[in-house]
């Protein structure tokens, strides 16, 4: 394997229509972003994990807790764009691997990040990676669960909110795989992604990863057995606290 420098960046914005101030939500006496940073920092492949925010309140809390952070612009259309600005401010090398770590996953399993970055050390041609896991037929039918189908070599063919693959004969066939929204990019691939216009399929499915596929940028998909649980609303905090207690136990 070739040694590859890997960095984790956590985009954290204060404004949220469903949960304003979410990164600062208290979980067992610490803000949510601290838990995400702490869990990600347990991944041995990541040389550094940094918070990327445009909000002074989040920056002040990060400073108080000794969490590395960078201040970014407030006009980014997506978290991926914020991650790219942060990577640029950190002056990362062209071949560095940048992991986009969701800021609302305080019970993140660090081994998922290890799975995510491993292909970069095994194959110099890999530009982007993500994760997927097996799901039930009921989950496959839900448009909120994004599905992915892959080539024999593990690269994504397509992501969709529809049930793919569709089993015409109603018998068991290829398993349904649900996409897990973690991404890692080589720095130059991340830069190119942010320079591309939104694609037709991206706008249709409301899935930004389709921009990569439509522009012939392959995405290596790694199967994982681990699960994540994001925080969308204040009521999700209790679930997260139970997950953190299980991890600590």
UniProtKB/Swiss-Prot annotation:
GO biological process: CMP-keto-3-deoxy-D-manno-octulosonic acid biosynthetic process; lipopolysaccharide biosynthetic process
Subcellular location: Cytoplasm
UniProt-listed Enzyme Commission number(s): 2.7.7.38
One Pfam assignment: CTP_transf_3
A Gene Ontology molecular function term of the record: 3-deoxy-manno-octulosonate cytidylyltransferase activity
Reaction it catalyzes: 3-deoxy-alpha-D-manno-oct-2-ulosonate + CTP = CMP-3-deoxy-beta-D-manno-octulosonate + diphosphate
Keywords: Cytoplasm, Lipopolysaccharide biosynthesis, Nucleotidyltransferase, Transferase
Pathway it works in: Nucleotide-sugar biosynthesis; CMP-3-deoxy-D-manno-octulosonate biosynthesis; CMP-3-deoxy-D-manno-octulosonate from 3-deoxy-D-manno-octulosonate and CTP: step 1/1; Bacterial outer membrane biogenesis; lipopolysaccharide biosynthesis
GO cellular component terms given for this protein: cytosol
Domain of life: Bacteria
InterPro entries, per database record: Cytidylyl_trans, KdsB, Nucleotide-diphossugar_trans
Described purpose of this protein according to its UniProt entry: Activates KDO (a required 8-carbon sugar) for incorporation into bacterial lipopolysaccharide in Gram-negative bacteria.
Record family assignment: Belongs to the KdsB family.
Protein name: 3-deoxy-manno-octulosonate cytidylyltransferase
Originating gene: kdsB
């Amino acid at each position: 394997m070739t040694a590859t420098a890997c960095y984790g960046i956590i985009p954290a914005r204060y404004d949220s229509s469903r949960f304003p101030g979410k990164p600062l939500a208290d979980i067992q006496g610490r803000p949510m972003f601290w838990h995400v940073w702490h869990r990600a920092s347990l991944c041995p492949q990541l040389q550094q994990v940094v918070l990327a925010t445009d909000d002074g309140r989040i920056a002040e809390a990060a400073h108080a807790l000794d969490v590395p952070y960078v201040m970014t612009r407030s006009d980014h259309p997506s978290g991926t764009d914020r991650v790219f600005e942060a990577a640029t401010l950190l002056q990362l090398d062209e071949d560095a691997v940048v992991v986009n770590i969701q800021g609302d996953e305080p019970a993140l399993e660090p081994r998922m990040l290890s799975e995510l970055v491993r292909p970069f050390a095994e194959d110099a041609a890999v530009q982007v990676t993500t994760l997927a896991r097996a799901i039930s037929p009921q989950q496959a039918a839900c448009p909120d669960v994004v599905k992915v189908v892959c080539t024999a070599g593990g690269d994504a063919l397509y992501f969709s909110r529809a049930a793919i693959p569709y089993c015409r004969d109603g018998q068991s066939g290829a398993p349904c795989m649900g996409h897990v929204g973690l991404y890692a990019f080589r720095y130059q691939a991340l830069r190119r992604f942010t320079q591309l216009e939104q694609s037709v399929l991206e706008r249709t499915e409301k899935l930004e990863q389709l921009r990569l596929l439509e522009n012939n940028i392959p995405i290596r998909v790694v199967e994982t057995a681990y699960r994540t649980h994001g925080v969308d609303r204040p009521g999700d905090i209790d679930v997260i606290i139970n997950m953190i207690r299980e991890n600590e136990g």
